[in-house]
Amino acid sequence: MSRQKSQTSKGHGASKGKEREQRTLIRFKTTLMNTLMDVLRHRPGWVEVKDEGEWDFYWCDVSWLRENFDHTYMDEHVRISHFRNHYELTRKNYMVKNLKRFRKQLEREAGKTEAAKCDFFPKTFEMPCEYHLFVEEFRKNPGITWIMKPVARSQGKGIFLFRRLKDIMDWRKGTAGKKVTSVETQATRANVNPSGSHDTRSSDDQKDDIPVENYVAQRYVENPYLIGGRKFDLRVYVLVMSYIPLRAWLYRDGFARFSNTRFTLNSIDDHYVHLTNVAVQKTSPDYHPKKGCKWTLQRFRQYLASKHGPKAVETLFSDMDNIFIKSLQSVQKVIISDKHCFELYGYDILIDQDLKPWLLEVNASPSLTASSQEDYELKTCLLEDTLHVVDMEARLTGKEKRVGGFDLMWNDGPVSREEGPCDLSGMGNFVTNTHLGCINDRKEQLRQLFRSLQVQKKASS
């Protein structure tokens, strides 16, 4: 149950210390009118509460979190869908700042080889505060392409590419609105529900009417891996249940998002070429709503295996595992790890021609609005399995390595794909418990899991 701190105790206040007691009635609340609402309303034993009613589970948006979290009392069993300062990972400038700091820490403590495992994000500068550092770097490498991104906006809004220092000088003076507006206008025409479907509605959103907001200037990956001549990125889902200790799950399914136009560096102003966001692509004249611009990760993995062989694919996906873990570790000491909180992150990964993955950003509010029937089914399963792992019903033992489509990849240390204790001293033959893009037989796994849990419960009673 949740209530404002100023209110008197009532309802399930006596539940303190009994968070593992099984519950048959879960009161939920959410303001997001999309796939999430369908999943919550169809979950057995879950009932919706509105307005100021007391709740056990709240899938909130980050604006509510910012305004109310510090003033809300929560009993032991209550769960909420964001960590208090999630923006340390999900706001672009903070993410880079934390990754840079973590890399330096690794170099001091473990050497350059270990620190090099953090070299998965393009060279990035925060603007305008690192403007002079950026200019110095820009002049060292004339002619390359850079991309400007507002630190706290989504759906391609405010993004533009450039190669001339004059473009950045115009932006710094607050006169680059023409380029920014062209992208914003196209994305706005997508007519997507702003209450629930936008990615990364950050805790520190900037208002659009200020002349120059904080941006990051990032070296543009000029050699992306292309399929059918088109650029794409990957959306991958990571569920964090705790930061101290770090406990993270990786979902087997996700998707590749394609641009609608063949890739070229000759037209850097054409965002249909360079931005893969669905909100941008669906405004393209060539966009087909039924066809969409997505592949499942399983299809993508099979395609790569046929082109490059299983070994190259294993290396690529292992490198992505490294991105997930290192990025979470980079904020482990700064995220407020409240036991009431969990977070479903949407990672955006770009693959280059050398099959090297690059982290573009991490979303605190990945879109849960479906763009097709296939997308609806994926997100429905994702959300159902998220609720299974969050386990409001207190059915799990806490020792599970797989729940539906989620695989436990980190539990205060790496989790092995093999059963039983593992020797981590050399990590030579260690294989992380991840199956991204592999077969997701979640229904059968859940059936067996809950049957086993029922047997264990009967045996112990």
Curated annotation (Swiss-Prot):
This is Probable tubulin polyglutamylase TTLL9. Coiled coil: none annotated. Mg(2+) 1 binds at D348, E361. PROSITE patterns: TTL. One of its GO terms (biological process) is microtubule cytoskeleton organization. The lineage of its organism: Eukaryota, Metazoa, Chordata, Craniata, Vertebrata. Signal peptide: none annotated. Gln-155 is the main determinant for regioselectivity, which segregates between initiases and elongases in all tubulin--tyrosine ligase family. A glutamine residue at this position is found in elongases TTLL6, TTLL9, TTLL11, TTLL13, TTLL10 and favors glutamate-chain elongation, whereas an arginine residue is found in initiases TTLL2, TTLL4, TTLL5, TTLL3, TTLL8 and favors initiation.
